[in-house]
Amino acid sequence: MEPPFFLLLLLLVVSSSSPSAALLSAKGVNNEVQALIVIKNLLKDPHGVLKSWDQNSVDPCSWAMITCSPDFLVTGLEAPSQHLSGLLSPSIGNLTNLETVLLQNNNITGPIPAEIGRLENLKTLDLSSNSFYGEIPSSVGHLESLQYLRLNNNTLSGPFPSASANLSHLVFLDLSYNNLSGPIPESLARTYNIVGNPLICDANREQDCYGTAPMPMSYSLNGSRGGALPPAARDRGHKFAVAFGSTAGCMGLLLLAAGFLFWWRHRRNRQILFDVDEQQIENVNLGNVKRFSFRELQAATEGFSGKNILGKGGFGNVYRGQLPDGTLVAVKRLKDGNAAGGEAQFQTEVEMISLALHRNLLRLYGFCMTATERLLVYPFMSNGSVASRLKAKPALEWGTRRRIAVGAARGLVYLHEQCDPKIIHRDVKAANVLLDEACEAVVGDFGLAKLLDHRESHVTTAVRGTVGHIAPEYLSTGQSSDRTDVFGFGILLLELVTGQTALEFGKSSNHKGAMLDWVKKMQSEKKVEVLVDKGLGGGYDRVEVEEMVQVALLCTQYLPAHRPRMSDVVRMLEGDGLADRWEKASGHSTAAADSLSHSHRTSDPAPPAADFAAAFGRCFSDLTDDSSLLVQAVELSGPR
């Protein structure tokens, strides 16, 4: 009896040391699973996006819309734009490890549960564009880690909780278009939006809150309010003017001299710096970003020293910088900042990227505009890019590679399906996917992508991208769409599997110029181990590798219409619907092969996908890895 008892005791000690063990109830039920099932039961899910949430499961980390930490704790509930309705359950307060809650653009109704204040690790809360009503719970003031709070476009009423003044880390707040009243705490957030609330006001002007509705207040980037001075300040100004009235003439002369000096210095400095407050750029929607002076960024990067260069891209160099408070940043210095079209590109990026807030997208931190310079400031990603990490030692473990694939896919889903207008990246590659401190994927460099309003595609006379990642239709016609990004993402998946860039992989002696055909051949012959990064050794799951290769081949099909949407890609990477999609794609391939065989007998056909890949590989065989490409489209169709 003694050995079994000892083993049981040892097992108990080991299991209790696991972080996730604390989540188990006395009956061995995962408390996070219980909470999520209660949330699911109160929501109406017409499209079945939560069908993978199984109450009999002990591991919610494999569920759709759920993100977990390396310790298998639920840290993200992300179900934006999923047509969900019903109520948000108070059980959300039991998910105490949550860091991100994204439920925007649904039709969830009812009050915001007060239990949400128990999420002490929560950093991002987005409940915007739903039908929540009632008061904002005072427990929101307990979310001391909160950085982003969006409650806009609901029907919330009552005052904003005074306890929210405790939110010392809050960077961005959007309460616009509700029915809120009363003052906003003075030091709540660096940037916030309260327009569309008829009786909301500044904390310093509380006496005006319940009178006639004032005009919406405007805010500068540093949070200062516009408008007239309060009455007490006007009285002091009047007394000051009377007391010194006898010296008005002298003061006038001094002011005139000072004005002349200011004009002279301003005219001289215009050759170096551009005043962004001038009328000609007032139409820039600055969003949630900070304005830097050129000298600030020059000092932060040590004069844009070559030793601080993090990378070079088609739009300019990226420099490592350190702000006076010690914050590390990445500064992108755009090429030809004063050239024709440069300002329009800059405005596009500042306006659009500042509104694109997602855990898997690189957030724009600030900007700088001068007469000759355009610069963008981002948070510094300590783990670099996926491309650099794949070349480093030790090899990136397989589980991390899978997590990177899913994270990058979710970021692209947000750009394609949740931004209005949608954003097409046009250069999806490992070098443009960064890794944060937890090795989570963060997609960057999408700010200068072509934006589509509500059209399906865009035709341009210039093709920008990286050799090996450019979709065939984009290279040949200049026509880009969200399926162009899907193609690039498929190549990214192969980079994660092989540990090589597209050009490295395509130039090897065994399969030069026909990479995708060779990958498909290895997959069909069940030889995927030939593809796997040798640095992994045996540390990978063969079935998972086969599935990722299948998804990559689906994404890189020659015809854009046959490629899946990025939301479908996410589901397939999570194990939902891949088998059916692969079978259907195999049918397409068989039909295409039969058609090609017939056309060879009857005429000289246009080059198929394989020939295109081979020709592409030969044309650019002299290029180096990650070479950027900016060429004129071979043939343009449709309007330019």
From Swiss-Prot:
Glycans are attached at N94, N107, N153, N166, N179, N222. Keywords: ATP-binding, Cell membrane, Glycoprotein, Kinase, Leucine-rich repeat, Membrane, Nucleotide-binding, Plant defense, Receptor, Repeat, Serine/threonine-protein kinase, Signal, Transferase, Transmembrane, Transmembrane helix. It is a single-pass membrane protein. Residues 263-640 are cytoplasmic. The chain crosses the membrane at residues 242-262. Its EC number is 2.7.11.1. It comes from the Eukaryota. The active site is at D427 (proton acceptor). ATP binds at L310, G311, K312, G313, G314, F315, G316, N317, V318, K332. GO terms for biological process: defense response. LRR receptor kinase that may be involved in defense response. Belongs to the protein kinase superfamily. Ser/Thr protein kinase family. This is LRR receptor kinase SERL2. It comes from Oryza sativa subsp. japonica (Rice). The lineage of its organism: Eukaryota, Viridiplantae, Streptophyta, Embryophyta, Tracheophyta.
